[in-house]
Amino acid sequence: NKNGIKDVYEDPSAPIEARIADLLSQMTLEEKTCQMATLYGSGRVLKDAWPTAGWSAEIWKDGIGNIDEQANGLGKFGSEISYPYANSVKNRHTVQRWFVEQTRLGIPVDFTNEGIRGLCHDRATMFPAQCGQGATWNKKLIREIAKVTADEAKALGYTNIYSPILDIAQDPRWGRVV
């Protein structure tokens, strides 16, 4: 926060309930709303791959809860940012830094990505679709696939991964079934 003092929400030694209450009491309606929103990463809603001066006039000037699929090699920027891997990590770090330093309260962004059959990144390991994985009935193999996906996501700086649904599908046309 840019007020020159360490607020309760910024103090990691303060009780979590006090930190949450302090942060919420300081947030505007716009900031709260933005924390419930997801932007699709570079080349999509987030038109620029790297922060620009224009970002301070966009809706995310008040922060954003989540950026999905940032610098994963898909969208208009392709592999230009996703590889080498250091470039992909640098991109997320630079975007994160912008949100922490340029928004009023400095709330970090959650970077998410798909992981239903491996990390959704143009250089990550891809695995068979969930139906194919499930047909093996091999729980150990599925756990190993999940570990590879998690390790690759963590190494690239993603903080949350969307994974397969553990539910019986009612409609086989649904994308998460295939």
PLM region spans:
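N-terminal beta-rich core of secreted/periplasmic extracellular enzymes
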Residues: N1-V178
